[in-house]
Amino acid sequence: CLVHVLALGFEPAHRSLAIYNHGDAAVGEALRAESVCEAIHDAGGLAILAHPGRYRVGFADLIDAAAELGFDGGEAWYDYDMQTRWSWSPVVCEAIDRRLKNLGLLRTCGTDSHGLNLEGR
């Protein structure tokens, strides 16, 4: 399952991120979540699992796997209903928040930074 990973507080020019900064999508080993997480950590950042309720794999399994790989947190509060005006989705967000909290992971809110236009995100 391919997932989005949000990197926070990292050094953009760090050599461990070079493969991700050349404009093309990463392939092979560099595409693996474990490799992405390690590169972010090497660059001094935090690795966050973005919107764990949007994948074909259940969020509980994804969060558990991310924790095992060393992720620092997950995006708990997200607009899964993709409303015209951003609003979190109570039932799924509360369940994700509990799961992250029980694992001692950081919880984030909002968006995993897909560009400048956040309308509807």
Residue positions per predicted region:
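Alpha-helix termination/capping residues and helix-transition junctions
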Residues: 68-71, 102
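Histidine/acidic-residue-rich catalytic or RNA/ligand-binding cores of hydrolases
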Residues: 1-4, 57-66, 83-95, 116-121
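Active-site beta-loop-alpha junctions enriched in small/polar residues
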Residues: 10, 52-53, 79-81, 112-116
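Alpha-helical scaffolding segments of alpha/beta enzyme cores, especially the outer helices
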Residues: 35-38, 61-64, 94-98, 102, ...
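Short acidic/histidine-rich active-site segments
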Residues: 104-120
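His/Asp/Glu-enriched short active-site or ligand-binding loop at hydrolase and phosphoryl-transfer sites
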Residues: 71-85
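Extended substrate/RNA-proximal surfaces in nucleic-acid metabolism proteins
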Residues: 1-69
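Active-site neighborhood of phospho(di)ester-bond hydrolases with catalytic His/Asp-centered motifs
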Residues: 48-51, 74-77, 106-111
